[in-house]
Regions:
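Short, surface-exposed "cap/lid" segments of acyl-processing enzymes
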Residues: 83-121
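Short beta-strand/loop motif that positions the catalytic acidic residue
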Residues: 295, 301-303
């Protein structure tokens, strides 16, 4: 029997039940010193520690920044590389649900989170990076949720990102002609919407990772279908599920069919939770392929072949079709990268939704070296940063 338990957390919590360097990120040593409103972190890369002696130290400064969206504070972490001169900037946009700026989630165990690893790796390369907690994520989520009931929307997510850009461009030594975004999963949709709306401070280039290429509701349905693969009454269950979704999308009252598994019913109930509206209904019909075709700036799409939340063939093909004839859209499908760009050694056929999500941020997990290399090289080409 396939368990639908993980679907209590649903697509809204990271497209299935949620959320660079290479293997040497596994055992970094951190020395932390606090000063006033900022923190300085010194990362000691184990690849340069030999015989107990540190031969090289890469240092950079991280500080907390905040901005306001509809009267609610958004908290971010700005990380600057050592040295002066004008620097390109990168804003990170997390995936769905309570995924925070580090791409950690209270729904998933572990703190080895890809957003933080990517930000540190790219800061080492010379970029100023900014990652932030959505208002419905991070340590302030409890106090924010009551204020967000009935107000959660696609535009609200874009406004959070716009605030991040405003904060980034006000940073000393940022190069306004070299602004980038690195988004994951649902965050890629918000990045595309921002790019199509922004009159100022448009991104020089967009890195879209784990990007859905089909309507979000269809991607979520495929995930359910995969979990139900071994059920003898799968087809009947999916018809009942589809009827509920049809009512939901149409804005009609939706009562989960009592014959559906508990996890499916929990997913359907979560869609109509007041705290998730109108956002959930907007998200369910969103088609990223319609957006990517409208963006003029260079785009890099990275979908790992070990990603079981979006399908590199189905979603990648949909995005490639939408971008046909556009010369500045690049696609990369790393062989061993999962949804959050971690290295996954197992065959894709061995991976199940129930256990993959809980391993995303597990201790010892590292970013996929090839995925990171693709991102670093593409950003270097677009920004002029020497590797």
């Amino acid at each position: 029997m396939v368990s639908f338990k993980c679907w209590q957390r649903s697509y809204l919590h990271s497209l299935t039940g949620n959320r660079l360097r290479g293997a040497f990120w596994a055992r970094n040593t951190r020395v932390k010193s606090l000063a006033a409103a900022s923190s300085t972190f010194v990362e000691l890369d184990q690849s340069v520690v030999k015989g107990g002696n540190v031969t090289e130290i890469q240092a950079y400064k991280s500080e907390e920044v905040t901005w306001d969206v509809d009267g609610i504070a958004v908290y971010g972490t700005l990380t600057r590389p050592a040295g002066g001169g004008k620097r390109p900037g990168i804003v990170f946009v997390a995936g769905s649900g309570p995924t925070d700026g580090d791409w950690c989630s209270p729904l998933l165990p572990g703190t080895t989170c890809s957003g933080r690893l990517l930000a540190h790796a790219l800061t080492e390369k010379g970029y100023i990076t900014l990652r932030y907690d959505k208002r419905a994520a991070g340590p302030h989520v409890r106090e924010n949720l009551l204020r967000l009931v009935g107000k959660m929307s696609m535009q609200g997510h874009v406004d959070e990102l716009a605030g991040a850009i405003t904060s980034l461009v006000s940073t000393d030594n940022i190069d306004l002609s070299r602004l980038f975004v690195l988004a994951n999963s649902e965050g890629t949709i918000h990045a595309l919407h921002y790019q199509l709306q922004a009159p100022l401070h448009r991104f020089t280039g967009l890195v879209l990772t784990g990007a859905p290429g089909r309507p979000v509701g269809l991607v979520a349905r495929d995930q359910l279908l995969m979990q139900a693969a071994q059920l003898p009454n799968r087809d009947d269950l999916m018809k009942r599920y589809d009827a509920c979704i049809e009512a939901f999308v149409a804005g009609k009252p939706m009562v989960p069919d009592p014959l559906l598994p508990d996890g499916m019913k929990d997913l359907l109930r979560s869609l109509e939770t007041p705290a998730n509206l109108p956002f959930a209904r907007e998200l369910w019909v969103e088609n990223p392929a319609d957006l990517i075709a409208q963006v003029a700036e260079p785009i890099l799409v990275v979908i790992g072949k070990k990603d079981i939340q979006v399908d590199w063939r189905k979603d990648g093909r949909a995005l490639e079709t939408a971008a046909a004839g556009i010369s500045n859209v690049t696609f990369a499908y790393p062989e061993n990268a999962d949804h959050v760009l971690k290295y996954e050694s197992r065959f894709r056929e061995e991976l199940t939704a129930a256990e993959v999500g809980v391993q995303y941020n597990a201790e010892g997990r590292v970013l996929d070296h090839y995925a990171l290399s693709v991102i670093v090289e593409w950003l270097s080409q677009q920004s002029g940063v020497n590797l």
